[in-house]
Swiss-Prot record:
Taxonomic classification: Eukaryota, Viridiplantae, Streptophyta, Embryophyta, Tracheophyta
Species name: Arabidopsis thaliana
PANTHER family: FLIPPASE KINASE 1-RELATED
A single GO BP: integument development
The name this protein goes by in its record: Serine/threonine-protein kinase UCN
Domain AGC-kinase C-terminal: 341-404
Gene that this sequence comes from: UNC
Stated family: Belongs to the protein kinase superfamily. AGC Ser/Thr protein kinase family.
């Protein structure tokens, strides 16, 4: 029997959330499967000293409900872990009514990595900033894989910044449980050795890449048929055949329907790193079909001088998952790459200072919320279901749409 995780929050994990007591401070986000609010408990936390994020899903959608329950199950596993990872979320509490299923998570006041990148000069991160965030993301993925969980939804929007400036992965509804494959401890990759050249000036990467692409020929065509599913037999490991993920981050093996395992996360890490470096993903096309074709046949394009960073990206974006960086020895291969030289992996949260520390929330919520502030969860959804009032109009014989 699963137990609820302990928490230092004002919430009591041993009991369900009482949605009637929760007051919404603001809407944090709204997606296809649910809505995320910043809330506080109006009874136990009337001064709003401990606001938290609440993800709420309407149970009218069977698919959304199934994914919500699965995400809560994954979050409970992460929270019950005897050795929790600082870059993965902690489930504070959950609740289910006849209409909704909801769960509470610590509030990450820094927003997501995509918004932060867009605020930078030229919309890209420097090499040192990329190294900081990648190191923490690699540790988070390593922890998930050790638990037999493939994340399958790595993208900037799902990487949140805690109040401390460190990252947290979010949204686990597309994740899956796999048995970790048995692979040789050491495996020699045929990819080129890391380039000794010093790293290029990343502030000019975006412009250089645009000029570089003008000289490139069009990629050859490839048949894309994501509907087809073929299950391959892989000794010592388990693979999933489900077609999930964000178009620009989906790996070649998923598009081909070959089945996939933890290597899809290392592919997505390569796409993420490329986007952090250049401000755009490497395989984006004019539509989904062209994007998938690019993923299958196109090689990533790099501007400027080769560097340890571009070498890391190239190794992660190998189309054959069995030759991809991280396939045989997991995160250990990636941590040993020259780009991460000098990183003290066991002391990430203690040694390195985050490059960006979130400012206090716009409204400085603590201690400034009155009894009338905020609105109830159910009140919010009732308003959504209320049809809008008709627009006022004048009765005129020239207006054929006027009802009498």
């Amino acid at each position: 029997m699963e137990t609820r995780p302990s928490s230092s929050s004002s919430l009591s994990p041993a009991t369900n959330l009482n949605l009637d007591r929760l007051k919404v401070l603001k809407l944090l986000g709204k997606g296809a499967t649910g809505t995320v609010f910043l809330v506080h408990d109006s009874v136990s936390d009337s001064s709003v000293s401990s606001p938290f994020a609440l993800k709420l899903v309407d149970k009218s959608s069977a698919s959304s409900l199934r994914r919500a329950r699965w995400e809560i199950q994954i979050l409970r596993r992460l929270s019950d872990d005897t050795n929790p990872n600082p870059f993965l979320p902690k489930l504070l509490a959950s609740s289910e009514s006849s209409e909704f299923i909801a769960w509470a998570l610590p509030y990450c006041s820094g927003g997501d990595l995509n918004v932060l990148r867009q605020r930078q000069n030229d919309g890209v991160f420097s090499s040192s900033v990329i190294k900081f965030y990648l190191a923490e993301i690699v540790c988070a993925l390593d922890h998930l894989h050790t638990m037999g969980i493939a994340y399958r939804d790595l993208k900037p929007e799902n990487i949140l910044l805690q109040e401390s400036g460190h990252v947290t992965l979010t949204d686990f509804d597309l994740s899956c449980s796999l048995n970790k494959p048995t692979r040789p401890e050491f495996y020699h990759l045929s990819d080129p050795e890391p380039d000794p050249n010093p790293e290029s000036n990343l502030s000019h990467n975006k412009k250089s890449l645009r000029i570089f692409r003008q000289k490139k020929k069009k990629t050859k065509s490839a048949r894309v048929n994501p509907i087809t599913r073929r299950r391959l037999s892989f000794s010592g490991g388990e693979r999933s055949n489900s077609f999930v993920g964000t178009d620009e981050y989906i790996s070649p093996e998923v598009i081909r329907g070959d089945g996939h395992d933890f290597a899809v996360d290392w592919w997505a890490l390569g796409v993420l790193t490329y986007e952090m470096m250049y401000g755009e993903t490497p395989f984006k096309g004019r539509n989904k079909k062209e994007t998938f074709r690019n993923v299958l046949v196109k090689e990533p394009e790099f501007a400027g001088k080769p560097s340890d960073l571009t070498d890391l990206i190239r190794r992660l974006l190998v189309k054959d998952p069995t030759k991809r960086f991280g396939f045989w020895r997991g995160a250990a291969e990636i941590k040993e790459h020259a780009f991460f030289k000098g990183v003290r992996w066991e002391l990430l949260t203690e040694v390195l200072r985050p490059p960006f520390i979130p400012l206090r929330d716009d409204g400085d919520l603590t201690g400034k919320v009155t009894e009338e502030s905020g609105f109830g969860i159910k009140e919010y959804f009732e308003k959504l279901k209320t049809p809008p009032l008709p627009l006022p109009h004048e009765c005129s014989e020239n207006n054929p749409f006027v009802d009498f």
